[in-house]
A protein has these predicted regions:
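Positively charged n-region of N-terminal signal peptides that target proteins for export
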Residues: 1-4, 18-19
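Residue-level detector of functionally pivotal "anchor" positions at catalytic/ligand-binding pockets or at interdomain
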Residues: 248-275
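Terminal, low-complexity interaction segments
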Residues: 25-27, 172-251
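N-terminal targeting leaders for non-cytosolic proteins
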Residues: 19-130, 137
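Extended extracellular/luminal ectodomain segments enriched in beta-structured repeat modules
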Residues: 137-144, 215-216
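Sec-dependent N-terminal signal peptides
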Residues: 4-13
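Short, glycine-anchored, charge-dense loop/turn motifs used at functional sites
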Residues: 282-287
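Short coil-to-beta strand junction motifs in C2/discoidin
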Residues: 156-175
Length: 290
């Protein structure tokens, strides 16, 4: 009986040591510790700033850092990529809106807007694997993140927009989340979440289970679409993010969450990236393989 008591006590002590950190956008600052400000349009005032102070958005006492305009080139103040913050409470098709009209806490509350630059990811020589990554202060185990459709992207998926055509039930738009090391290299497994698949679109905040990922120094975010042209993806590559949770210990969420949250598995077969979902295989562009 005493042995059982001491075993349970030791197990409880180990469990109690685990610490979870959830993204808190109210703590967001620049590199110098100054609080992030929003302009009259309810977006981060420094969204188009290439100043070094805004290369990362620091949250949770710098335990979670979001990349912003990592290339340092805003093309004269008219371009941005990576992550920015928004408090927009509308859903009109704007790039800084999400279909939920706000973060997890409700309409008008802050959320993260991501814009993935395929051009930067494929051509940069800065040592970063993507325009969109979240860096941790040390190695953590990812637990979960909430993803929501961008209003601008949903408009394109439904109606077409500029060079982007409307989606059919054969099209897919996927967000690929992968762990990174301290050298910003992608390592280990990936989680693939579909913003559009089988004629269905993300219509609000959905939890994505990240517990299959190993301990890492951060996360990279990439996007793929079946609508591509000579210059790459035609579909607007925006997405919204909130509620990222990381832990000092491995999180076991159970097999029942795999189908609903992970959505798909990424595998490398004969040098080709394949995505497996519901017994089907897709290539990296999201095309169904027979």
């Amino acid at each position: 009986m005493k042995k059982l008591f001491f075993f349970c006590a030791a197990l409880f002590a180990l469990t109690a040591q685990a610490e979870e950190i959830t993204l808190n956008l109210y703590t967001a600052t620049d590199a110098y510790g100054a609080g992030i400000e929003y302009n009259t349009e309810n977006i981060m005032d420094s969204t188009y700033s290439k100043d070094y102070a805004y290369m990362f958005i620091y949250t949770n006492d710098a335990d979670i850092m979001l990349s912003h305009l990592i290339s340092g080139n805003s093309w004269g103040g008219i371009y941005w990529d990576g992550f920015t913050l928004s408090k927009k409470n509308t859903d009109t098709g704007n790039q800084f809106e999400c279909v939920a009209k706000g973060g997890l806490e409700g309409e008008g509350t802050p959320f993260v807007v991501g814009y993935y630059s395929e051009c930067y990811a494929n051509n940069n020589t800065d040592g970063y694997t993507t325009s969109n990554f979240i860096e941790f202060s040390e190695d953590y185990y990812p637990k979960e993140v909430y993803i929501c459709q961008s209003s601008n992207t949903l408009k394109a998926l439904k109606e077409g927009l500029s060079v982007a055509r409307p989606f059919t039930d054969k099209d897919t738009l996927a967000l690929i989340i992968t762990g990174i090391n301290k050298q910003y290299e992608e390592v280990g497994k990936s989680v693939v979440y579909h913003l559009a698949v089988d004629g269905k679109f993300n219509q609000g905040w959905e939890k994505v289970d990240l517990s299959s990922l190993d301990a890492c120094n951060g996360l990279s975010f990439r996007m793929t679409s079946t609508d591509k042209g000579q210059l790459g993806i035609n579909t607007p590559t925006y997405f919204a993010l909130d509620g990222l949770t990381i832990s000092t210990e491995k999180v076991e969420t159970g097999i029942q969450n795999v189908e609903t949250s992970v959505k798909a598995t990424k595998r490398l077969v004969n040098g080709e990236l394949l995505i497996e979902r519901n017994g089907n295989r897709y290539n990296a562009a999201g095309q169904l393989l027979k």
